[in-house]
UniProtKB/Swiss-Prot annotation:
Designated name of the protein: Large ribosomal subunit protein uL15
Subunit structure: Part of the 50S ribosomal subunit.
Annotated source species: Thermosipho africanus (strain TCF52B)
GO molecular function: rRNA binding; structural constituent of ribosome
Biased composition (Basic residues): 30-44
Record key words, sorted: Ribonucleoprotein, Ribosomal protein, RNA-binding, rRNA-binding
Tagged with keyword Ribonucleoprotein: yes
Gene3D superfamilies documented for this protein: 3.100.10.10
GO process annotations (BP): translation
Length: 147
């Protein structure tokens, strides 16, 4: 087998159509563009959001809402996760949460939520606590400290 023997797969290559080369070719005169009109012109493309001259939908609808750039985005951890990953009497910090793989990054801080049950007394140091999480941690003899 030689490099010159390689041929494209049958049906994969299409013959180029030469337009505007006489009426006998079947694509002469108007070159398949019909008669007159915007789409028959040289730059006759209409952009997809063009609505024929009427006021477009994106200008008819009002603007609303905003992005609060001062909002704090906490990384959340539930007390049931702390129960699974830590032993009785351990100190739980955001760095240790990263270490054991409970969180991927700290963002604006770590918030502990009260989903699930906890039986081990832990010293939990975080940026925020939900009221139920604080109650559950302190009920078993642990501490909830805000950074």
């Amino acid at each position: 087998m030689r490099l010159s023997d390689i041929r494209p797969t049958p049906g994969s290559m299409r013959k180029r159509i030469r337009v505007g080369r006489g009426i006998g070719s079947g694509k002469g005169k108007t070159s398949g563009k019909g008669h007159k009109g915007q789409k028959a012109r040289g730059t006759g493309k209409v952009h997809p959001w063009f609505e024929g001259g009427q006021t477009p939908i994106h200008r008819r609808l009002p603007k609303f809402g905003f992005k609060n750039f001062t909002k704090k985005v906490y990384t959340v951890v539930n007390v049931e996760d702390l129960e699974r990953k830590f032993n009785s009497g351990d100190e739980v910090t955001p760095e240790k949460l990263l270490e054991v793989g409970l969180i991927k990054k700290i963002n604006d801080g770590v918030k502990i939520l009260g989903n699930g049950e906890i039986t081990k007394p832990l010293t939990v140091v975080a940026h925020a606590f939900s009221s139920s999480a604080r109650r559950k941690i302190e009920a078993v003899g642990g501490k909830a400290e805000v950074i």
